[in-house]
Amino acid sequence: MSEYSVFTSESVSEGHPDKIADQISDAVLDAIIAKDKYARVACETLVKTGVAIIAGEVTTSAWVDLEELVRKVIIDIGYDSSDVGFDGATCGVLNIIGKQSVDINQGVDRAKPEDQGAGDQGLMFGYASNETDVLMPAPICFSHRLVERQAEARKSGLLPWLRPDAKSQVTCRYEGGKVVGIDAVVLSTQHNPEVSYNDLRDGVMELIIKQVLPAELLHKDTQFHINPTGNFVIGGPVGDCGLTGRKIIVDSYGGMARHGGGAFSGKDPSKVDRSAAYAGRYVAKNIVAAGLAERCEIQVSYAIGVAQPTSISINTFGTGKVSDEKIVQLVREHFDLRPYAITKMLDLLHPMYQPTAAYGHFGRHPFELTVDGDTFTAFTWEKTDKAALLRDAAGL
């Protein structure tokens, strides 16, 4: 972290247009794999004034009422009336989903499951840092918590004038790789037209910002920008078109780590854009939890139709207790990063994906879910169950 004295990350709420699209795409994925866990799903969503469009490629034996599903997601987020500019009950829903290409499918499916090839070529990154309790960079962690709190205050009625769309941004100051202060906070939230700016500013400051950000990191020179344009009544899909996969930095590490470019939402685990990025987080988090490094970034790459990664590399930015080369060796010994093995290691063939589509795919706490009698753990890639093994293997 020594290369930065300050660093900024942003997040967006579940009511942001791009996040509506992500949540719809993952709801479609969940609904299908709940009935057919080996389905192939690639679902993209577009939302704009009065309409939601789902497109992509799916291969499955399951039937799902996708129109009803799309409407439910939109309404559950909070777009349930024309008064807020978008109504899941009355918007148009267009379904143009087709079948997966047989050319792609023949590169993925194998007689032996463990030989399953990657669904595409690509490079994926995983990252962890010991600067927060969830081993995530502080700026993105705090940014997520702000918009998550905004949704809580809206849905509970604590701040009844809030509407679903919101964005946050946090600038942290670092000394010696440690967070020592928060220099700037931006929170823009959609609201109804009746609330005064003074009431909005005071409510957001007292009941959102001060409830989330550590008081010891705020100081007399911290800048607070609350709805800096003054008015944010028009929002959601009316204000901006929303598309799946347009918030990949929000979804990952807030820019602190590199990104391979592939989005996550709407993709089943055979797509390494998603599953290998989750595995990368799992590896990096266990390395940091084991005390092998204070920061760790892993890159994994794949060729379409090939099971074994084409490369694995590690960067601990000079914080490693052992060499990066030694850590690569440990990763190869203790983590099987073939696509099928990742799916087994992280138990990914369950309908766990819609919760990932807002407030970050990483830095979350694993929890149990039950869907149609199927009980499983979500966010398995956040476990640190291999930390002790890695520490012993490294001789620490």
Curated annotation (Swiss-Prot):
Binding site for K(+): E44
UniProt-recorded Gene Ontology molecular function terms: ATP binding; magnesium ion binding; methionine adenosyltransferase activity
The keyword Magnesium is annotated on this UniProt entry: yes
Cofactor(s) essential for the protein: Mg(2+); K(+)
Region (Flexible loop) residue spans: 100-110
Signal peptide: none
Pfam families assigned: S-AdoMet_synt_C (PF02773), S-AdoMet_synt_M (PF02772), S-AdoMet_synt_N (PF00438)
GO cellular component terms attached to this protein's record: cytosol
EC code(s) of this entry: 2.5.1.6
Domain of life: Bacteria
Residue numbers binding L-methionine: E57, Q100, D240, K271
Catalytic activity: L-methionine + ATP + H2O = S-adenosyl-L-methionine + phosphate + diphosphate
One record GO biological process: S-adenosylmethionine biosynthetic process
Pathway: Amino-acid biosynthesis; S-adenosyl-L-methionine biosynthesis; S-adenosyl-L-methionine from L-methionine: step 1/1
Cofactor note: Binds 2 divalent ions per subunit. Binds 1 potassium ion per subunit.
Keywords on record: ATP-binding, Cytoplasm, Magnesium, Metal-binding, Nucleotide-binding, One-carbon metabolism, Potassium, Transferase
Subcellular location: Cytoplasm
Binding site for ATP: H16, D165, A166, K167, D240, R246, K247, A263, K267
Major localization class: cytoplasm
Binding site for Mg(2+): D18
Subunit structure: Homotetramer; dimer of dimers.
Similarity comment: Belongs to the AdoMet synthase family.
Function: Catalyzes the formation of S-adenosylmethionine (AdoMet) from methionine and ATP. The overall synthetic reaction is composed of two sequential steps, AdoMet formation and the subsequent tripolyphosphate hydrolysis which occurs prior to release of AdoMet from the enzyme.
Name recorded for this polypeptide: S-adenosylmethionine synthase
UniProt organism field: Pseudomonas aeruginosa (strain ATCC 15692 / DSM 22644 / CIP 104116 / JCM 14847 / LMG 12228 / 1C / PRS 101 / PAO1)
Taxonomic path: Bacteria, Pseudomonadati, Pseudomonadota, Gammaproteobacteria, Pseudomonadales
